[in-house]
Amino acid sequence: MKSCKQLIVCSLAAILLLIPSVSFAADSNISVKLLNYIGNKSSISLSPTGFYKVTGDNVAVTDRFAGASRYETATLASNSQWKNPNTVILVNRDIFIDALPVIPLAKKLNAPVLFTQPDTLTKTTERQIAKFNPDNILIIGGARSISKDVENKLKSYGAVKRISGKNRYVLSENIAKQMGSYDKAIVVTGRVFQDALAIAPYAAAHGYPILLTEKDKLPDYDLPKQVIIIGSSFSVSDSVENQIKKTSTVQRIPGSTRYELTANIIKQLKLKADKVVMTNGTKYADVLIGASLASKKNSQILFVKQDSVPAAAKSITKDKATYAYDFIGSTSSISAEVENSLADEFYLADGGTYNLKINSGKLNLENIKTYGNSLRIKPENYSTSNRISLDGKQYLGTVNFSIESTKYIRPVNENIPFEDYLKGVIPNEMPASWSLEALKAQTVAARTYSITKTGTTVPDTTAFQVYGGYSWNSNTNKAVEQTKGKVLKYNGSLITAAYSSSNGGYTEASNEVWSSSVPYLIAKKDTKDPQIGWTLTLSKQQLDTKSLDLTKPSSWWSSATETDSARLSGVKNWILKNKETSADSVKIASIDDLSFSGTTQGQRAKTASMKVKYFVKSSTGSYNLSKITTISVPTSELRTMIGATVFKSTYVTVKKDTSKYTISGKGYGHGIGMSQYGAKARAEAGDSYSSILKFYYPGTTLTSY
């Protein structure tokens, strides 16, 4: 049906036949193609409220770095981010204690981290160093970690420097000395690798050193004024924390598991995590490679299990709207099932703004990924707490976007609960401020009209019913809820519940507009309709021919326009279709006569006659300036030609004077069935919604579907 905000115009496109009696479930769904408010656009702005996610095959951005060995995996990861680094850092493949503090320094030096065997320079690593051709090679750890023989071999590829220490704690302090000045430091246990590498990307991003400590004894460090302790008191004891507090302010980030720890770091430090590196939290080499990659890409690291994503990590990917994943290691580290589960959906940021556009014939979620011809975005669960805004208009439930006519994005609001669909329709078909009984009558008419379309997709336009998504109003919600399931039937079958804005004081019979005569859609006087009046003027002379050089029409054809050009485009289209089928274009020079004849059962003008003089430009570029025709059509057809928003009904008369025609009319719309303004007046007079429906649809029964 049709809605024009203050004044409502309704039309019916369906064939008026009795609808067979069918049983409809109260929880039936309906889908809506969004055209009315969205229009035809090549880009749409999306903004979710609550939890919405993109779903489908491989919708997230994913990459996996998996070699046959840790050396190859490190090589693959380094190749993805570095081309010709000035420095390469080398660590022992197994002795994790050397590598724990190195990531912040690697970030400072913009250096990849590679593995080697202790006594032999691993061939894969050697080839990678040769490829990078660095000026400097930095060895981490003493000769027991990486031998002098390896060091000597490395000298053929660049200047070699070694950072070592008599123990892991001194080594971390010596690495910290290479960081320059800093106002904050990270203190972690030196007994396990997960705590230090979990915080490493954050520390690297801010230039904070990572200092190792024993659980119950803090080495003699010169600490800055701010310290972050990573891990619970089982990793770094309360006594160590209290010792640090004597000189520094302390923030502790605990975690009951390694998986929870990486999540807590992101949450407590309020880090952006739309892109993350995922590693198996039990595998040192994968975690070190992941920490190096994350620090280079300014992303975060999350630990997962081989066959599952722990709840803490899932919570981060949801709350932080993670859409890009780098997986470290083969499927023996992180299974294909885990990768696929993350690849096949990702959450959008609550309150975030995204731009969906067409790029080279495909849908592109800007700054995220390019897809195919469709993309589905759905809420975590259907709820008014989860909403999605499309170009500023909110909708509930799932929206599927597809490319239409190769150039437009067409959203479909999928599987809306039918009664919620009505809540989005009623305030767009009748002002929500009107009397509740009028709104209830409107609701029953709208429900009856659309209930047979459950399980299908309908438009949100006046071609069916205007659906405004989550444009709910408490008053219209009440009307829907208080009439839940109520419909109109005639002899046991659903009726075609036509309605219009105003009938002008007389309802129209269905057979006067459509081919079918329906016993409950009859012509009769309506004393409650306010008989809304309107006028429309059309000038007799449409082109100022005195100012035109009629001998040279090509000089003015493209610039000359009719006085009422906006209202005559349909008339010109009729001429091109019915009279001048091979012409390029026509112009209306004058309207020489306009009249209406015949009267319908509903007191409306049956036939319209318009005599026009027009000019023709042929497809070959020749002109004819002496054409005349009389257009004789049903008045409803002329109304469509001129425009139903200005030629508001066929309940009309015409007055002629020397310069113009004045069409005077009553009502707005076809006049069949219920008058919305009439329903308003009847409700204000005290009529119940059932009485209103009984008047406009005589012989019908108000019942449940």
Swiss-Prot record:
Stimuli inducing this protein: In stationary phase; under control of SigD. Repressed by LytR.
Q: List the GO biological process terms.
A: cell wall organization; sporulation resulting in formation of a cellular spore
InterPro entries from the entry? Bact_Sporulation_Assoc, Cell_wall-bd_2, SpoIID/LytB, SpoIID/LytB_N
Q: Which terms are listed as keywords in the entry?
A: Cell membrane, Cell wall, Cell wall biogenesis/degradation, Membrane, Repeat, Secreted, Signal
The main place the protein resides is membrane
Localization annotation: Cell membrane; Secreted, Cell wall
Question: Which first-to-last residue range defines the signal peptide?
Answer: 1-25
Annotated GO CC locations: extracellular region; plasma membrane
Residue windows of the sequence repeats: 64-161, 162-251, 252-349
In residue numbers, the region (3 X tandem repeats) covers 64-349
The protein's matches in Pfam families, at most eight in alphabetical order, are given as: CW_binding_2, SpoIID
Q: Which domain of life is it from?
A: Bacteria
Q: Does the keyword GTP-binding apply?
A: no
Membrane topology summary: Peripheral membrane protein
Q: What does this protein do?
A: Possibly involved in cell wall metabolism during spore formation. Enhances the amidase activity approximately threefold.
What's the protein here called? Amidase enhancer
- Organism, by scientific name, is Bacillus subtilis (strain 168)
